[in-house]
C-alpha cells in the first residue's frame, strides 16, 4: 500500500522579506525608544568623547552624617540651550597651558587700611563713585579692612592655587558633599577649598567625619577644610561671613586664574575643568551664572524675599530697592541684551579672574555689606552700572539642573558645644523672633504713589 507523505510548504520569499523588515523595524524602534528615554534626562549635557573618571570613592562618610539626604527633584527634562563638552584630555591640556602662562599686566589696585567693619562700611555715594573704573591707577574698595582669620599655613597653600573650586558652611547649615565625575588628572590641577566655622567643625567632629586628634590640616575627600576662627573682625550674621569667600575669592586666592563658587547646598556633578572650558573659555566671557528659574526683574525677587521671609528686615529691603531706583535701576527689557535677565541663581558662579570680573565681585560685596547678603537683589544694579562691562554667560536653568544636584539645608543641627556659642545662637534666635513679629510685607511701603520705584513698577507691570 502506498504511504501518504505530508510536506510543509515554506512561505514565499517575499513574505519572509516582509517579516524580516518588520523585525528590523521593531528592533530599531526599540533601540531608538531606549536611547531617547535614557538620554532625555540629560539633553543639556553632550560629551565629545569618553574620559577617564576617578573610579574610587573620594571619601567614605559615616552613616550618621547623611550627606545624600533631602535631594531636591529637578523639574525639566528637556533643554533649549544644551552645553557641549570637549574631550577631557584636550581640555586638560588647554587649561594647564592657560594656568602656566603669564598673568595680565593690568591688575586692580585695592584700598588698604583699617575700618570698623570688614568691608569698610562705605556710604552710598562713595560706593557708587567707584563704578566707572576708567583709570586703572584708582584704588577700589574690596573688603579686607580687617584681617581674615585663617592660619598662615592655609594662606600659603591658597596663594599657590591656579584654579579653585570653593564653598563655605557656616552655622552648620549644610553638608560637605564630594564632587562627582572628576577626571583622573583633575585633583592635580584643581584646588577644592571648604570654609567652615567652629559650629560646623563641631558637627563634623560629632559625626566622626573629621577626627579630633587629626592635625589642623583637615581634609574631607577632595576638600581642604579651612576653619575660620571666631573673630571680632567678622560679621555676627553667618550668611554675611559666607559672602566673603563667595565674592572676594579673587583676593583669597590671588594667583588663581579661574574659580568656581559652589553653594554648600549643591553638589557638583561635572568635572570643573570641563565646566570652565565650555562655559568660560570657549564663549570668551568673564563669568558664567545660571538664570533664575522664575524671575526676570529685580523687584520680583525683592518682593518674593519679603513674602517668603528670606530676609526679615522688610524696611531694609524697601530702602535698598528705593536706593537703586533713585540711582537708575530699570526693569529688564531687550535693551539690556545680551544679558537675558536681571535675576540669577547665584548658587553656582564661574569666573575667569581679571579686571572686569574682579570689579564686579568687589562692588557686589560692597552692596551686600551695605544692605544684606541676598545677592540677587544687588546683581542687576551693579552689573548694569559698572564700567568696564562684565561679559556674562547667563545659561539656562535646565543646564544648572544637570551640572549640579541641589539639597535642602540641614533640618537638624548639632547643639553648640560652648557657652559662648550658645549665647551667640540665642542672640541670633532673638533677632529672628523680632523679625517674625513684624509684618512680612507692608503694602504701603511698596505703593506706587509713595515709592521712588514708581516708574520701575509701572514699567514692570505695564
Swiss-Prot record:
Pfam families: TOD1_MUCI70 (PF04765). It is a single-pass membrane protein. It is found in: Golgi apparatus membrane. GO terms for molecular function: hydrolase activity; transferase activity. The chain crosses the membrane at residues 19-39. Pathway: Lipid metabolism. Its EC number is 3.5.1.23. Glycans are attached at residues 121, 132, 449. It catalyses: an N-acylsphing-4-enine + H2O = sphing-4-enine + a fatty acid. Preferentially expressed in pollen grains, pollen tubes and silique guard cells, but barely detectable in roots, stems and leaves. Residues 40-462 are lumenal. It is an enzyme of class 3 (hydrolase). Disruption phenotype: Increased turgor in pollen tubes associated with altered and delayed pollen tubes growth. Short siliques resulting from severe sterility. Insensitivity to abscisic acid (ABA)-induced stomatal closure in guard cells. These phenotypes are partially restored by the disruption of GAUT13. One of its GO terms (biological process) is response to abscisic acid. Residues 1-18 are cytoplasmic. Keywords: Abscisic acid signaling pathway, Glycoprotein, Golgi apparatus, Hydrolase, Lipid metabolism, Membrane, Transferase, Transmembrane, Transmembrane helix. One of its GO terms (cellular component) is pollen tube. InterPro entries: TOD1_MUCI70 (IPR006852), TOD1_MUCI70_glycTrfase_dom (IPR048354). PANTHER family: ALKALINE CERAMIDASE TOD1, ALKALINE CERAMIDASE-RELATED. Endoplasmic reticulum ceramidase that catalyzes the hydrolysis of ceramides into sphingosine and free fatty acids at alkaline pH (e.g. pH 9.5). Inactive on phytoceramide. Involved in the regulation of turgor pressure in guard cells and pollen tubes. Belongs to the alkaline ceramidase family. This is Alkaline ceramidase TOD1. It comes from Arabidopsis thaliana (Mouse-ear cress).
